[in-house]
Amino acid sequence: MAAWAPCRRWGWAAVSFGRHPGLSASLARKPPRAWWLSACRQKASLSFLNRSELPNLAYKRLKGKTPGIIFIPGYLSNMNGIKAVAVEEFCKSLGHAFIRFDYSGIGSSDGNLAECTVGKWRKDVLSILDDVAEGPQILVGSSLGGWLMLHAAIARPEKVIALIGIATAADGLVTQYHALPVETQKEIEMKGEWTLPSRYNKEGYFRIPYSFIKEAEHHCLLHSPIPVTCPVRLLHGMKDEIVPWQRSLQVADRIVSPDVDVILRKQGDHRMKEKADIHLLICTIDDLIDKLSTVVP
């Protein structure tokens, strides 16, 4: 049974799907850390993962203790976002390993964006896990990255020991597309492109190839149980106009792991990058590191 435990101080609520104490109480007890100011200002240097038959991937890595943290960005986002950098600073302050990277076709990575698909970006995540990361990892996925982290946990259960999703967009654009009127879907198919309005793009919209949507259909997860057995934390803003917060409840319901919490931010939007949002994210990571420290060598 899901149990709500609102915390007025920070304005979030935890919904526990497992037989363990909800996160909201422990989060409320944690004082804000001084990691914002005390962490070293030096950033990890830019490196490239060379792949023989795939585009080279740009990444930044901090070596340190396990479990390591890997930040998986959202759709068309690069590794330099506020959340990714904040998590890096926190990991640096604790001495934990951390990786952030750009998908192929994005940011500093090689590749042609027009040819990118969910399947290719899934391979990017697995490449980082297989060829860059060392030891057990906690994956932090934002939006599309939340969808891809689920795929990574399914494909590499021996290496992925926990997940944190931020506005997890499982089945993302596919669900939005199929919610359109049939006539609109036919128009998009004829044009070969979907012009999707968005205030998060300076042009006011995204141009999404029809082929991208059709390929993404092969990676949908919500139609059946999701075979992820590790601890999962799903953070979502209730003012998210891109991915409704109910999507995180759907994901939680589908995941087979008994250790799943959904944490809602009443004032949070899709990007979840305000100070209180970042604080919640950091506390959630800290909580999982504490939890896993008893089982991870």
Curated annotation (Swiss-Prot):
Catalytic activity line of the entry: S-hexadecanoyl-L-cysteinyl-[protein] + H2O = L-cysteinyl-[protein] + hexadecanoate + H(+); mycophenolic acid O-acyl-beta-D-glucuronide + H2O = mycophenolate + D-glucuronate + H(+)
Active-site residues (renumbered): 143 (charge relay system), 240 (charge relay system), 270 (charge relay system)
EC number: 3.1.2.22, 3.1.1.93
Transit peptide: 1-43
Record has Hydrolase as a keyword: yes
Keyword check for Nucleotide-binding: no
Compartments (UniProt record): Mitochondrion
An example Gene Ontology molecular-function term: palmitoyl-(protein) hydrolase activity
Keyword terms, alphabetized: Hydrolase, Mitochondrion, Transit peptide
Enzyme's top EC category: hydrolase
Pfam families in the cross-refs: Abhydrolase_1
Residue stretches making up the AB hydrolase-1 domain: 69-196
UniProt xrefs under Gene3D superfamilies: alpha/beta hydrolase
Primary site of residence: mitochondrion
Single GO BP term: protein depalmitoylation
Family matches, as InterPro entries: AB_hydrolase_1, AB_hydrolase_fold, ABHD10_acyl-thioesterase
Protein role: Acts as an acyl-protein thioesterase that hydrolyzes fatty acids from acylated residues in proteins. Regulates the mitochondrial S-depalmitoylation of the nucleophilic active site residue of peroxiredoxin-5/PRDX5, a key antioxidant protein, therefore modulating mitochondrial antioxidant ability. Also catalyzes the deglucuronidation of mycophenolic acid acyl-glucuronide, an active metabolite of the immunosuppressant drug mycophenolate.
Family membership: Belongs to the AB hydrolase superfamily.
Protein name: Palmitoyl-protein thioesterase ABHD10, mitochondrial
Lineage, broadest ranks: Eukaryota, Metazoa, Chordata, Craniata, Vertebrata
Gene: Abhd10
